[in-house]
């Protein structure tokens, strides 16, 4: 898991790839809705194994979303939600202290869009340029 400052270095992805922007994540979720997965986008992206509490998905698009959890920087700096949540940074800031990310949850089906402190740790996906 990486904090957003590591994302912002542009060194996490190989040449010819980049961490998607918030807008690029929205293109993905909008496509899923238009392709018949409205309201169930998370199921279509989640891996078909590895999720706790009946949270496995169908992985219809080969995204293989796994529940790597997240790291909360403030407080103890512990890792949380492994097996229950998958969180991926975007390369877009929402404010000077926060950045956008996407969340898959074992509990609900939409792909959630939220912003969080740049010090926290989330997974990273690379998108081909």
Predicted regions and their residues:
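Conserved positions within compact, well-structured domain cores
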Residues: 1-129
């Amino acid at each position: 898991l990486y904090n957003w400052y590591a994302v912002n270095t542009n060194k996490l992805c190989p040449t010819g790839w980049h961490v998607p922007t918030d807008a690029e994540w929205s293109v993905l979720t909008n496509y899923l809705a238009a392709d018949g997965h409205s309201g169930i986008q998370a199921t279509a992206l989640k891996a078909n194994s590895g999720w706790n509490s009946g949270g496995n998905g169908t992985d219809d698009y080969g995204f293989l979303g796994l529940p790597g959890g997240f790291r909360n920087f403030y407080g103890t700096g512990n890792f949380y939600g492994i097996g229950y949540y998958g969180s991926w940074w975007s390369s877009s800031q929402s404010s000077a202290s926060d950045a956008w990310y996407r969340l898959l949850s074992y509990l609900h089906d939409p792909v959630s869009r939220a912003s969080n402190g740049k010090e926290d740790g989330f997974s990273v996906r690379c998108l081909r340029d």
